Design a protein with these regions (language model features):
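Asp-box/WD-like beta-propeller blade repeats and closely related beta-sheet repeat scaffolds
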Residues: 148-171, 176-218, 229-232
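Gram-negative bacterial Sec-dependent N-terminal signal peptides
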Residues: 1-20
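Residue-level detector of Asp-centered blade-edge/turn motifs that repeat once per structural unit
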Residues: 95-98, 167-170, 216-220, 271-276, ...
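Conserved beta-propeller blade signature
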Residues: 99-101, 171-174, 222-226, 278-282, ...
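Beta-propeller domain segments
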Residues: 30-73, 109-113, 119-128, 132-134, ...
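Blade-level signature of beta-propeller repeat domains, shared across WD40, Kelch, NHL, RCC1
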Residues: 418-442
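Hydrophobic core register within WD40 beta-propeller blades
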Residues: 92, 165, 214, 267-270, ...
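Surface loop/turn motifs at the tips and blade-to-blade linkers of beta-strand repeat domains
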Residues: 81-86, 153-159, 199-206, 259-263, ...
């Protein structure tokens, strides 16, 4: 039935799509993919003229197998698979004893509004794993510290699309798609002691963006949870966006919460910067205004700040699709700190530490899941953003690549990234259902 609808929709829309492919303006910047990818990273990305059309460019590389291959890492580092046969691994948490918790699951399922939603959904699904999400937490243990995680077992199951994880004073918090829940945790335990207790519910109606990123404040008093929008650009109306496209601050003891920062379309990963205690996020920006708009980004998250969605992007660049317009909100919008490139789909972020060594000792690792709405795929790798004096400084460096075989095939898609205290980068790959571990070889 869906295939029939897709074919019917594609035929019906073909004449209009052909017209929509005409550039929105005659300037070189408005020509399809005229903006170099390198020009769209950093604190001041190039922003071309928007291109409107019924259908964006769509290409998703099909799943390929790793075989004997492994991802590519810089000289002086090695990479190994420490866990396989997972069920859609998303985010990870390194526990005090070195054990690793992996959140596995899939959520969402928002009703389709338009024929092109069915088409886009069909295209996106071509690049996904055929494995059903586990809706569980898996625990990995390397008991003798030799880098081989000989234990892989279920810590907790029957969860509801778990994503964000945080450990605070003996409480393990899990951000399901509909609630933050809490398990009691004792160092070294391998399974949860009974079902979790709900700390607070989270917006889950419609669930266009279902992932709930989470991290804890440096003092453990608060949890920060990222809640994505219920649409690309308010197609369901502003009422459907109540309590969405924002980061909540939640009291870890009582569950009381407030909006911490707003106007962030889809904050997919959160982390606290060591030393400063500052909250940082990666976010996925809006679609359907061209292959080179709008850059996904890495940014510090300021208390009370508005980051533009849906009324504007990258500060105060107005998006007329959001109706009714709100000039007052646009005037208050601030630009993010650092562009990662349009449609790279950043889903993970973790700050480095000195143990990672060399040029990778000070900065942030970002997992880029990869694009679906560009004719030339971007992302599909982990990049390192160097920092200086607490801020991004310099161009991103490919740190884990080799996922993308060519434009039509990919072996993996990075999601969560986590640096452990020993100086290893962990990468969750939700296509090959693998956890990769990258370590210095010195």
């Amino acid at each position: 039935m869906i295939r029939s609808l897709l074919l019917t929709s594609a035929v019906a829309l073909a004449p209009v799509a052909a017209l929509a492919a005409t550039p929105a303006a005659t300037t070189p910047a408005a020509t399809a993919q005229a903006t170099p990818v390198a020009a769209q990273v950093g604190p001041q990305p190039t922003l071309p003229e928007p291109q409107r059309g019924l259908l964006p460019d769509m290409k998703v590389p099909r799943p390929a197998t790793w075989g004997d291959a492994v991802p590519t890492v810089p000289q002086g580092y090695s990479v190994t698979a420490i866990a396989t046969d997972l069920k859609i691994p998303r985010q990870m948490l390194v526990l005090p004893n070195g054990d690793i918790l992996v959140a596995e699951g899939s959520g969402g399922g928002a009703p389709k509004l338009r024929p092109k939603d069915f088409i886009a959904g069909f295209i996106k699904n071509l690049g996904k794993s055929g494995v059903k999400g586990g809706n569980r937490l898996t625990l990995l243990r390397d008991a003798d510290g030799d880098g081989t995680y000989e234990m892989q077992g279920v810590f907790a199951e029957n969860l509801n699309a778990p994503y964000g994880l945080a450990l605070v004073n003996g409480s393990l918090f899990v951000a399901n798609q509909d609630a933050v829940v809490r398990f009691d945790y004792v160092d070294g335990q391998t399974t949860a002691n009974g079902p979790p207790v709900t700390l607070t519910t989270l917006p889950s109606e419609i669930n266009h963006h279902w992932t709930k990123a989470m991290t804890a404040s440096a003092d453990g008093r608060f949890l920060y949870v990222g809640i994505g929008s219920n649409s690309n650009i308010t197609e369901r109306g502003l009422a459907a966006e109540q309590d969405r496209a924002m980061v909540w601050e939640i009291d870890a003891r009582t569950g009381a919460h407030r909006p911490y920062a707003t106007g962030i379309r889809n904050p997919t990963a959160l982390t606290i910067q060591p030393g400063t205690g500052t909250l940082w996020a990666v976010a996925n920006e809006r679609d359907e205004i061209g292959p080179d708009l709008v850059p996904d980004y890495l940014t510090s998250v300021q208390d009370g700040a508005f980051y533009g969605w849906p009324f504007s992007y990258w500060g105060q660049n107005v998006d007329p699709r959001a109706q009714p317009q709100d000039p007052e909100k646009v005037a208050s919008a601030i630009a993010p700190d650092y562009a990662l490139g349009s449609h790279v789909a950043a889903l993970g972020v973790s700050f480095s530490n000195a143990a990672m060594g060399g040029q990778f000792a000070d900065g942030a690792f970002v997992g880029e899941h990869g694009s679906w709405n560009r004719s030339d795929p971007v992302g599909y790798k982990v990049v390192f953003v160097p920092f200086q004096n607490g801020k991004p400084a310099g161009e991103p460096i490919d740190f884990v690549s080799g996922f993308l075989v060519d434009e039509g095939n990919t072996r993996g898609r990075p999601v969560g990234v986590t640096v452990d205290p020993k100086g290893a980068l962990l990468v969750a790959d939700d296509l090959s259902n693998t956890i990769w571990r990258v370590t210095p070889t010195r």
